[in-house]
Amino acid sequence: MAISKIHSRYVYDSRGNPTVEVELTTEKGTFRSIVPSGASTGVHEALELRDGDKSKWLGKGVLKAVANVNDTIAPALIEANIDVADQAKIDEFLLKLDGTPNKAKLGANAILGVSLAAAKAGAAQKDVPLYKHIADISKAKEGKFVLPVPFQNVLNGGSHAGGDLAFQEFMIVPSGAPSFSEGLRIGSEVYHHLKSLTKKKYGQSAGNVGDEGGVAPDIKTAKEALDLIVSAIEAAGYTGQVDIAMDVASSEFYKDGLYDLDFKNPNSDKSKWITGPQLAELYEQLLNEYPIVSIEDPFAEDDWEAWSHFFSKVEGKTQIVGDDLTVTNPIRIKKAIETKAADALLLKVNQIGTLTESIQAANDSYAAGWGVMVSHRSGETEDTFIADLSVGIRSGQTKTGAPARSERLAKLNQILRIEEELGDKAIYAGKDFHKAHSL
């Protein structure tokens, strides 16, 4: 079935910045997608096209990207008359139309909006749910669907928060729950205990939430943050059922080959900056003391040596996730696999810019025995595509923020609906989240 109309406009994301929305029409109806945007972005990501006109939206307008959809992509794609259920063909057409390696001509945000809207239209054409269409495209293992463990970002530091804490995200991981819905309930209870403990210890305003719904108290060290989370898990009565994950986002505090854990202080003492191996020692201490099952971006995106050194020490003990390291880019993923730098991919569709390339990145990772964590961005919207993506590719783990703020809950609520719809045709990844694709 062909596409009859494509229309784009700008709408606003959860940080109040403009972003691209695309509506794609076929005989089956009109299908909408909204593109997210990140705060800490890797230098190797596909290009998100912003207008740069400082007189509007502080330079963050997306009028060019919207015009690229309406004036360039729409007429060309409609004329090409490609079957909307053939996602690979649509994405290939979009890539050729752009013609640059990083989607700089049309903008990854323009291309992705069309790619995701087409996937929704393709699912409707086949009369199947979006996650089933994605499973077909990705040639996922047949059998029961896998519902992901929700990694919930409950405490924020780094570039996502004020205070001195260098590490960006601390997540609770309800891997001991019997089902997704129970995992979400446990997460929400731990989160409420964490909020009240935080207010008690750091004052009322410390309960305010950051971009992704986590609390952002004025915490100095990772140990202090982890102690607070462990106390919340205990207070909720779930010790042993809830693990912890961290996203360090260490590229944000990598300077001159060293790591500055006091990077938010403009006068930080250079003599206290530490080397990759010293930072690795800090992680090893934390791994020994806390139930940490996953560490994302422990080192800077081009500090390959530090990644390989650390991974050789902790392989099999905890999952090491590449985000800024890999930026969902096949060339970077291949290098990370070959250098044994990590064993899991953080999958962000807007880092690469089409659904087909995102699925390819996941499949390349699975083939190497890696895990895949499907992720939101800090600038999110009400679009729930990544919920279906996570179920469709059997990722077994998803990162969509705290159980707070509607743009975060939109994804978690969508997985709740999928769980209900599938009933006994689905299993919860639980402790097997790292190898969920083969369950």
UniProtKB/Swiss-Prot annotation:
SUPFAM superfamilies: Enolase C-terminal domain-like, Enolase N-terminal domain-like. Keywords: Allergen, Cytoplasm, Glycolysis, Lyase, Magnesium, Metal-binding. Its cofactor is Mg(2+). It is an enzyme of class 4 (lyase). It is found in: Cytoplasm. The active site is at residues 212, 348. SMART domains: Enolase_C (SM01192), Enolase_N (SM01193). Disulfide bonds: none annotated. GO terms for biological process: glycolytic process. Mg(2+) binds at residues 247, 296, 323. NCBIfam families: eno. HAMAP family: Enolase (MF_00318). Homodimer. This is Enolase.
